[in-house]
């Protein structure tokens, strides 16, 4: 029999129908809304946006937060390492609140901000405690959107990556390759390979002796990420909210390719994830083919949907601008276009 923490909370069917049939929370961008299923973020789905610092992850979160507040839904914003930019959010709300209405009917920005709850969770313990007790939140039935800004920071603080981690993984892969090669080798090469495996075993022993905590740290990090993923999946299933998570990228050195950026969270994070959007930029001042100059690279951002449901598959790169009034579409670039960025799209997949 499953314990109470592993059982989903039963909910009326009518509430589930109303939640999943409700319109999504848009980005004010047709390209991004289409990439997330046609109407933006939908309730019951976990979406992630990852990218290097300054790529516009928080700007996307602010945009959908403003649209969710304007729709009358309550929003919970979890801040980890930096406070929510309230002035930018207020500016987005002011730009969308009609100014031609009568004073009695006009929706005040402060009234909209009353629907926003900010939770400060600077470390992993705070994150886990908040997610485990999410069903005890006030106004639970009114919550439509959950934002977790920079989830990767608490994980990094709890289990920081180090060069020993990559050395351990590299040695483990090399040992596995040598073992498989030894099994399929011919008889005349058996003696030579056994000597190599003997040295490899000594290296493994020395490595384990000097880095006894490396494997434990890696396993604990993976377990923590898996726990967060399971808790978020439980929240979407029981509370019918849309979850939007922003994360950072990390560098990885690949033989023959060099350094590349990959999402920080490991592959077990993808099990319950519905959408993963990767942001990047191009530092170019070239003109487009039609002769029109492109916007400044400081405002223009590119995106690629690294994971999405098969029914929503879109093989294209997205380009949008970050402006003071919000997000604006620029263009959609097919992936087979001759104008490709320097780093391959596949290099961004974990």
UniProtKB/Swiss-Prot annotation:
**Keyword Nucleotide-binding appears in the UniProt entry:** yes
Drop me one GO molecular function for this one. Answer: ATP hydrolysis activity
Q: Which InterPro entries match?
A: HR_Repair_Mediator, P-loop_NTPase, RecA_ATP-bd
Q: What is its main location?
A: nucleus
Query: Keywords of this protein's UniProt record, alphabetized?
Result: ATP-binding, DNA damage, DNA repair, Nucleotide-binding, Nucleus
Residues recorded as binding ATP, renumbered to this chain, are 51-58
| Key word ATP-binding present | yes
Output the PROSITE patterns linked to this UniProt entry: RECA_2
Alphabetical GO CC annotations of the entry are:
cytosol; nucleus; Rad51B-Rad51C-Rad51D-XRCC2 complex; Rad51C-XRCC3 complex; replication fork; site of double-strand break
A GO biological process held by the record: double-strand break repair via homologous recombination
Coiled-coil features, chain-numbered ranges: none
Compartments (UniProt record): Nucleus
Q: Give the span(s) annotated as Disordered.
A: 331-350
Spell out where the chain crosses the membrane: none
Task: Summarize the protein's role.
Answer: Required for radiation resistance and meiotic viability and acts in recombination and recombinational DNA repair pathways.
UniProt record similarity statement: Belongs to the RecA family. RAD55 subfamily.
Q: What is this protein called?
A: DNA repair protein rhp55
- Which organism encodes this protein? Schizosaccharomyces pombe (strain 972 / ATCC 24843)
User: Which gene codes for it?
Assistant: rhp55
């Amino acid at each position: 029999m499953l314990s109470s923490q592993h059982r989903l909370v039963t909910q009326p069917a009518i509430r589930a129908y109303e939640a999943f049939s409700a319109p999504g929370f848009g980005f004010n961008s047709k390209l991004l809304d289409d990439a997330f299923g046609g109407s933006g973020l939908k309730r019951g789905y976990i979406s992630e946006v990852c990218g290097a610092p300054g790529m516009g992850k928080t700007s996307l979160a602010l945009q959908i937060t403003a649209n969710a507040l304007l729709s009358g839904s309550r929003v919970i914003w979890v801040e980890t390492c930096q406070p929510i930019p309230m002035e930018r959010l207020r500016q987005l709300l002011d730009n969308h609140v009609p100014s031609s209405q009568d004073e009695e009917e006009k929706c005040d920005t402060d009234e909209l901000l009353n629907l926003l709850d900010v939770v400060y969770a600077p470390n992993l313990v705070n994150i886990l405690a908040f997610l485990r007790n999410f069903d005890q939140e006030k106004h639970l039935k009114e919550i439509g959107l959950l934002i977790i800004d920079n989830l990767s920071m608490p994980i990094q603080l709890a289990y920081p990556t180090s060069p020993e981690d990559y050395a351990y993984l590299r040695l483990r892969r090399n040992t596995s390759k040598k073992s498989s090669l030894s099994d399929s080798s011919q008889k005349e090469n058996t003696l030579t390979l056994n000597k190599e495996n003997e040295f490899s075993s000594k290296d493994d022993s020395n490595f384990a002796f000097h880095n006894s905590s490396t494997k434990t740290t890696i396993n604990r990090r993976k377990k923590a990420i898996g726990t967060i993923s399971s808790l978020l999946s439980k929240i979407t299933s029981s509370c019918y909210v849309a979850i939007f998570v922003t994360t950072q990228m990390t560098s990885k050195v690949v033989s023959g390719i060099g350094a590349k950026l990959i999402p920080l969270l490991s592959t077990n994070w993808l099990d319950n994830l519905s959408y993963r959007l990767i942001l990047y930029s191009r530092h170019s001042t070239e003109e487009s083919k039609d002769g029109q100059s492109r916007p400044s690279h400081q405002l223009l951002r590119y995106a690629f949907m690294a994971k999405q449901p098969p029914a929503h598959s879109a093989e294209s790169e997205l380009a949008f601008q970050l402006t003071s009034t919000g997000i604006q579409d620029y263009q959609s670039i097919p992936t087979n276009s001759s104008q490709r960025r320097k780093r391959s799209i596949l290099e961004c997949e974990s």
